[in-house]
Regions:
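A conserved structural/catalytic subdomain of Rossmann-like adenosyl-cofactor enzymes
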Residues: 1-163
């Protein structure tokens, strides 16, 4: 478990950090593996080390994926209307990942060790609660309101004069 508090969970996470070069923790939303499993899942990207050691200054990249391009429900549907962070993940891999706020951040091995080796993305996110916000153009919104008003007036006229 990435965040379990029992001794065995902690020992496994410490073993991973001592014996591998953990490069990334990618946190995926609940529902990615629906209909088989609805739980939040993470995957780890790591390389083998030549010798076991805990390098406290080593940085680990965290990426918080909000969607995979699907509905994240048991009745799986895909389409452009669903958030898809996979292209962003692939684009950032091997590049300057620090620019992808609030999706990505770095944490040191020392900070992870100080937190009982917990590898849950939420534990280290400096952006907890922040979401990327996109706003529609006000002119587009006003145009939509005007169209709806015209439709309403047309419907009201038809109701007044049913022939």
């Amino acid at each position: 478990s990435l965040f379990g508090t029992n001794k065995d969970d902690k020992d496994i996470r410490r073993f991973l950090l001592e014996n591998t070069k953990l490069e990334a923790v990618v946190s995926m939303p609940a529902g990615v593996f629906q209909p088989y499993a609805g739980v939040k899942t993470s995957f780890l990207i790591f390389k083998k080390k030549t010798r076991p050691e805990l390098v406290e200054g080593e940085k680990i990249w965290f990426f918080d994926m909000k969607g995979d391009g699907s509905s994240l429900s048991a009745a799986k549907k895909f389409g452009p209307q669903y958030k898809n962070d996979i292209p962003k993940l692939l684009e950032l891999w091997g590049k300057d990942q620090s620019v992808a706020k609030p999706y990505s951040w770095f944490t040191t091995v020392k900070e992870i060790a100080d937190n009982d080796y917990i590898l849950s993305a939420n534990t280290y996110s400096p952006y907890n609660g922040e979401e990327e916000t996109t706003h529609r153009d006000p002119k587009e919104i006003l145009g939509e309101i005007e169209r709806k008003e015209r439709e309403m007036i047309t419907l009201l006229e038809k109701m007044k004069n049913p022939h």
